[in-house]
């Protein structure tokens, strides 16, 4: 009984852990989606600014152009950096989607398994109740048969005692009868001898 209850409790705990892990994945996915959207908006704005700057700036004479000191990254560099960041975010998003799909599939399997385990547990509990009732009936039947056997053994013991007593009485009577026969035969023999003697002397 305790074994399957421990397994069921462990399965429920594993389900709770997976659901909590899914919450973290959902949050990370939402943050990544927000970050991706912000990056795409920033790229679009920078591209528009770069195009307007290129159209409004007059073409200068190459001979009059002087090298200007570095004043920070150019819009093109920023665009490239944002695109790289966007690509990394997209890759991370794909990984999160795969992880989310895998965990969701495992969660569904676990839920189906829990449903099956619940049905199996219910069936086993019903079977256990049925077997307990049958076992109780068998115990009662065994007690009744034990009482019957005990009574029968008592009757056999009483009968054997009576039989032994009857055999002893029969043996005693047979012995007494034999003694009576022997005495009678002896007396008859003496009487016959006496009659023979009397006949001879008459």
Curated annotation (Swiss-Prot):
Keywords associated with the record: Autophagy, Coiled coil, Membrane, Protein transport, Transport
Gene3D superfamilies xrefs: 1.20.5.170
Organism whose genome encodes this protein: Emericella nidulans (strain FGSC A4 / ATCC 38163 / CBS 112.46 / NRRL 194 / M139) (Aspergillus nidulans)
Subunit structure: Homodimer. Part of the atg5-atg12/atg16 complex. Several units of each may be present in this complex.
Protein name (database record): Autophagy protein 16
Free-text function comment from the UniProt entry: Stabilizes the atg5-atg12 conjugate which is necessary for autophagy. The atg5-atg12/atg16 complex is required for efficient promotion of ATG8-conjugation to phosphatidylethanolamine and ATG8 localization to the pre-autophagosomal structure (PAS). Also recruits ATG3 to the PAS. Involved in endoplasmic reticulum-specific autophagic process and is essential for the survival of cells subjected to severe ER stress.
A GO cellular component entry from the record: phagophore assembly site membrane
Taxonomic lineage of the native organism: Eukaryota, Fungi, Dikarya, Ascomycota, Pezizomycotina
Main localization, broad class: membrane
InterPro entries named among the record's database cross-references: Autophagy-rel_prot_16_dom
């Amino acid at each position: 009984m305790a074994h399957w209850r421990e397994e069921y409790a462990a399965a429920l705990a594993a389900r709770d852990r997976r659901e909590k892990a899914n919450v973290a994945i959902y949050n990370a996915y939402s943050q990544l989606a927000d970050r991706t959207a912000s990056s795409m908006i920033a790229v679009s704005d920078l591209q528009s600014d770069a195009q307007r700057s290129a159209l409004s700036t007059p073409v200068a004479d190459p001979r009059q152009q002087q090298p200007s000191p570095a004043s920070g990254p150019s819009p093109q560099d920023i665009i490239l950096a944002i695109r790289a960041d966007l690509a990394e975010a997209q890759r991370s998003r794909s990984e999160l989607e795969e992880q989310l799909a895998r965990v969701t599939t495992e969660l569904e399997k676990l839920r189906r398994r829990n449903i099956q385990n619940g049905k199996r547990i219910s069936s086993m509990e019903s079977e256990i109740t049925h077997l307990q009732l049958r076992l109780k009936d068998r115990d009662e039947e065994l007690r009744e048969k034990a009482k019957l056997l005990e009574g029968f053994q008592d009757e056999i013991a009483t009968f054997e005692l009576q039989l032994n007593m009857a055999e002893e009485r029969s043996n005693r009577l047979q012995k007494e009868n034999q003694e009576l026969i022997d005495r009678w035969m002896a007396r008859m023999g003496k009487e016959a001898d006496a009659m023979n003697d009397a006949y001879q002397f008459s």
